[in-house]
Amino acid sequence: VNGEQTVPGSSFTADDCPAPTDPYAVSKFEAEQALLQLAAEGTMEVVIIRPPLVYGPGVKANFLSMMRWLNKGLPLPLGAIHNRRSLVGLPNLVDLLVCCLGHPAATNQVFLVSDGESLSTTELLRKLASALQRPARLLPVPQGWKLLWNHNFPHL
């Protein structure tokens, strides 16, 4: 809902103007607006929680793919990624949900939840490798080379 990126060195906040960029994000934003309208009419109370990537037992999608790559010991061209990404552990997300259920000040608020540390893809892979007790074989391939490769070989 917030968008795909922030100004380098900054993070998203609940006060940011939403900037959804794809149909899924637009639909989430429209649902939030509809719920907030119902809340404004006194029909119901709403708490909006916008989690980043959630990790924990049963994790799937990109996070699981990264774990599989590391478990296989594959060299990855991701050793020079300087992005920042927030994450939230499942227990922390559940704690926030429970807190919001019982706290009247949460009513009609928007919360961005995270573990409080933003990691680059490179840092995340190193931490995952350490937790998996596997080597992080990360090659520092410059971003320009990756863009050139993806442009010339989009199906690989």
Across the structure, where does each feature detected by a protein language model lie?
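Flexible, glycine-rich beta-alpha linker
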Residues: 2, 22, 44-65
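Conserved catalytic-core motifs of eukaryotic protein kinase domains, centered on the activation segment
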Residues: 3-10, 59-61, 78
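Short glycine/proline- and charge-enriched loop/turn segments
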Residues: 9-18, 130, 153
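Short-chain dehydrogenase/reductase
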Residues: 10-13, 21-30, 53-56, 83-88, ...
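A short C-terminal helix-loop "cap" of Rossmann-like NAD(P)-dependent dehydrogenase/epimerase domains
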Residues: 17, 67-78, 134
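Active-site Tyr-X1-5-Lys
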Residues: 19-47
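Substrate-positioning beta->alpha
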Residues: 30, 59-65, 79-102, 108-112
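Mid/C-terminal beta-alpha module of Rossmann-like enzyme folds, strongest
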Residues: 99, 103-156
